[in-house]
């Protein structure tokens, strides 16, 4: 017979039921509208961010995440179908990596198509809720800095280069950066960071 806490993850201290990724509604919303108007939830207005400002915005956002990972409830979901701050942090880390790779694709090819990425399948496959918050904190900081450095290297004449998603949505490097920065800002808002 086990007592409460015997099945807890030794690194996070969370019970398996607290971190099970199932039960999250898959994201199906097309968020490209955030490039045209301010987000009513997080307040981010992509139109107010010029391409060269993306790098500093990414760094400022990343600087706020370490405090989130130090919370005692970082692995707890606020509601059953809402990611925990830890899961959001894992997602943000992976989004940083994804958008840096998309940026490099646009910079190295003419109007490339981006591979689809299923964020929900990734969360389950990579067991976001079971990851070590201290490790994720370091990885998010490194991924955000790498992405910020890549956006910081974009030359003045390259901000209009394009790439596209499989659904046909076209991004310039500038709008890709704006969209990316909104995603990170929105998720920091989601976790009250």
Question: Which sequence ranges carry the predicted segments?
Answer:
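Acidic/histidine-rich alpha-helical segments that form the ligand environment
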Residues: 57-61, 66-68, 123-161, 180
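Short, contiguous alpha-helical
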Residues: 2-36, 73-123, 156-193
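Secretory/endomembrane lumenal or extracellular ectodomains immediately following the signal peptide
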Residues: 27, 32-48, 57
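Hydrophobic alpha-helical segments and helix-packing faces
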Residues: 51-54, 58, 81-85, 92, ...
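Short low-complexity stretches enriched in small and charged residues
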Residues: 43-47, 54-55, 103-105, 143-144
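Solvent-exposed interaction patches of small proteins and small membrane subunits
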Residues: 46-56, 109-111, 130-131, 135-138, ...
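A short small-residue
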Residues: 40-45, 120-128
């Amino acid at each position: 017979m086990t007592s409460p806490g015997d099945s807890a993850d030794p690194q996070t201290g969370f019970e398996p039921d607290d971190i099970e990724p199932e039960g999250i509604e898959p994201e199906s919303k097309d968020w490209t509208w955030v490039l045209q108007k301010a987000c009513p939830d997080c307040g981010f207005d992509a139109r107010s961010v010029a391409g060269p400002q993306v790098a500093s915005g990414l760094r400022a956002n990343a600087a706020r995440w370490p405090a989130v990972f130090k919370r005692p409830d970082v692995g707890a979901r606020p509601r059953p179908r809402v990611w925990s701050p830890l899961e959001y942090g894992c997602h943000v880390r992976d989004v940083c990596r994804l958008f840096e790779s998309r940026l490099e694709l646009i910079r190295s090819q003419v109007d490339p198509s981006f591979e689809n990425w299923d964020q929900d399948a990734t969360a389950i496959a990579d067991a976001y809720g079971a990851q070590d918050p201290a490790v994720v904190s370091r990885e998010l900081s490194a991924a955000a800095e790498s992405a910020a450095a890549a956006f910081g290297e974009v030359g003045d004449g390259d901000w209009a280069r394009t790439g596209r998603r499989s659904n046909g949505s076209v991004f310039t490097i500038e709008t890709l950066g704006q969209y990316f920065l909104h995603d990170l800002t929105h998720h920091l808002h989601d976790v009250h960071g």
